[in-house]
Amino acid sequence: MITESREHLQSKPQNSESIIRLDTPDDRPSLECDSLPSGGHSSKVSGGPASIEGKDVKNVSELETCATKAQTPHDEVPISTSKIIAVVGGLVLAVFCMSLDSTILSTAIPNIVSQFHSQNEMGWYVSAYSLTLASFSLAFGKIYTFYSTKTVFLITLSLFEAGSLICGAAPNSLALIIGRAIAGIGGTGMYLGALLLVAEILPFDKIPITTALLGAMYGIAAVVGPLLGGAFTDYATWRWCFYINLPMGGLTFLFVFFFVKRGKDKKRTREANNIVARFLELDPIGVALMIPTLVCLLLALEWGGATYSWHSWRLIVLYVVGGCCALGFVGVQIWRQDTATIPPRLLKNRNILGIILFSFCLNGSFVVLAYYLPIWFQSIKGVTAIKSGIMNLPLILTMIICSMICSTLVTKLGYYTPFLYLAPIIASTGAGLLSTMHVNSGSPVWIGFQALFGIGLGCGGTLSIVAAQTALPPEDISTGTAIVTFTQTLAAAVFNFVAQNVFQNQVLSGLAQSAPGVSAAKLTKAGPTMLREVVPADTLPAVLEVYNTAITRAFYVSVGGAALAIFGSIPLQWLSVKDRKTQAVTAHA
């Protein structure tokens, strides 16, 4: 808060020496500002409520100039345009690799199982990666809060590369699972670091379009992953599903290492006088409770009703352990307050609460369609897995194009809130129309409905990260970004679980009524692409109707998620990315 009015400031003599100081809590950074336009007088600036000493300030804009420099440490070390392009290109490659690892194994797993004779372990080839990807996201948010973004990013990139190398060279199933877990830990830190590096090296009004570019990698990987996995498996070896990460990750490492200057560790950590004190800054108790909480939750969602009964002792153990750890985690966060993994004060920020709800619902809505649309194409239209990926392109391409357009508009206009209002309205309409599809729906129907949902998703999918970063002061950006990315990952697990239960229950009840002679277990084992091979011709139409109904009922989950996302948009303030630096100063007033 500036303690003198504009009129009073302008009434000061313009030739006198002055000092401008923005006072802050002890753990906030400060710097000397000696480049005021009014005669080059020396000033001291630190972020926080302002007081003014001396006799000369030409106008308030001079104060804002100093404040801007204090609040944007990355502006102190400018990077050339060519280096920025190289670094952003490297970050895009890294995020693409991380996203690719979530989808590329879908067509390679049968060959891996055949080579390792590991039918009972194949579920862990996917789960080991997704579990660690979700479980460590908040922990890395805490680490990035205290340590150099460049340093932590390079470490997590190295972890991801090491995990990929272990997977590619795995002599047995256990080694592959361990490699996948290591890659997941590195991947979540690498993705978060990419978002934070973008926020550090770019002007804030250029961040939306770059974030959209990173987010587009998820959509591209969803389509390209199965195609690459199938190509590597058929024409080379499944091991190249992992080796492909090494050259791309290596290029990213070189760009970031040489072109991004290492920032200083945060002040609070620098003041810690020993290793133990630094370690305690990272909330180790909270992290130790959070990780088993998430692992228990995700395992329960994955195993429940599919691998084990909901009442089995394994699931009960997960409920008890997960519940106790969750209660302990909440207690630790309340106790540690500002040094917690999730500082409670952030959850009092209406923008953050809104973005959490918005991201959870909209991303969950997308995940359901991304999973069940290919099943609809394979089972109802009888196409191959690769062809179903191509038929899914209308959603992915419109999402990418609309995301880039909206991000460009945000860069020009400054405001992102209107797009976050539009996103759930358009997306829920598109998902609702997809839920009306039937067995004989033609290409104009499924292309148009997918495109409509893709437009809605593109309007708001990546802007949620930008909204969180705009609404938070610089010292909270890493934590806020981690919360949003964690929310998106958790949404994928929760919404898939709900949709899977809707789908399975509808298939069971539908077969019992329309095709009682067909075994649901037999259909599940065969998979959607083999539906016509295992079902007698005389009962195939009835089974297709059952499958179509089950899939479109699962789409209802997507409709509900997209519609609920509007309640996350409503609390958002109208903040501009163009005023981000000034808002960072006044946010503490």
Swiss-Prot record:
Subcellular location, record wording: Membrane
Source taxon at top rank: Eukaryota
Keywords: Glycoprotein, Membrane, Transmembrane, Transmembrane helix, Transport
Cross-referenced InterPro entries: MFS, MFS_dom, MFS_trans_sf
Transmembrane segments: 84-104, 121-141, 151-171, 182-202, 212-232, 240-260, 285-305, 315-335, 352-372, 390-410, 419-439, 445-465, 479-499, 555-575
The keyword Glycoprotein is assigned to this record: yes
Pfam families in the cross-refs: MFS_1 (PF07690)
The UniProt record lists the keyword Transport: yes
Role description: MFS-type transporter; part of the gene cluster that mediates the biosynthesis of paraherquonin, a meroterpenoid with a unique, highly congested hexacyclic molecular architecture.
Native organism: Penicillium brasilianum
Family: Belongs to the major facilitator superfamily. TCR/Tet family.
Listed name of the protein: MFS-type transporter prhG
Residues carrying a glycan: 59
Region (Disordered) residue spans: 1-54
Membrane topology: Multi-pass membrane protein
Any GO CC annotation of this UniProt entry: plasma membrane
Compositionally biased region (Basic and acidic residues): 1-10
GO molecular function: transmembrane transporter activity
